[in-house]
């Protein structure tokens, strides 16, 4: 077993942005990302298309999650179904990363994915 007391102490922060694609899409539409029902789908024109992200409320109240299919989303006027906006997602992710750089050196930020 490793004796961690011999290692230097460091503070590490891990950030995972909650339902990132859905949250960014919701904010862009003027919606509350925590309470709205929103799914980002690979292609809204194809019923078999995969849900890339679902808002927390859509997950909780309708059981729709990443990997679900468009045809599984019930027809409900409260649910927003949108196509991905990759340029927007990349821009927002970049801005958030730049925010981290205000507090820690760039070499200390290790980005795993866009979200």
UniProtKB/Swiss-Prot annotation:
Superkingdom of source: Bacteria
Protein's UniProt keywords contain Manganese: no
Family membership: Belongs to the DNA polymerase type-Y family.
Positions contributing to Mg(2+) binding: 16, 115
Residues covered by the UmuC domain: 12-115
Cofactors required: Mg(2+)
Protein's name according to its UniProt entry: DNA repair protein homolog YozK
InterPro entries to which the protein is assigned, alphabetical: DNA/RNA_pol_sf (IPR043502), Rev_trsase/Diguanyl_cyclase (IPR043128), UmuC (IPR001126)
GO molecular function list: metal ion binding
GO BP, one annotated term: DNA repair
Cofactor, how bound (note): Binds 2 magnesium ions per subunit.
PROSITE patterns xref list: UMUC
Secretion signal span: none
UniProt entry keywords in alphabetical sequence: Magnesium, Metal-binding
């Amino acid at each position: 077993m490793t004796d961690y007391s011999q290692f230097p102490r460091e503070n590490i922060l891990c950030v995972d942005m909650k339902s990132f694609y859905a949250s960014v899409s919701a904010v862009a539409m003027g919606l509350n990302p925590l309470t709205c029902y929103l799914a980002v789908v690979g292609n809204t024109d194809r019923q078999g298309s995969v849900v890339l992200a679902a808002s927390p409320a859509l997950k909780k109240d309708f059981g729709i999650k990443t990997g679900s299919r468009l045809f599984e989303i019930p027809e409900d006027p409260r649910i927003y179904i949108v196509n991905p906006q990759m340029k927007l997602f990349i821009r927002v992710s970049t801005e958030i990363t730049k925010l981290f750089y205000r507090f820690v050196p760039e070499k200390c930020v290790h980005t795993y994915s866009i979200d």
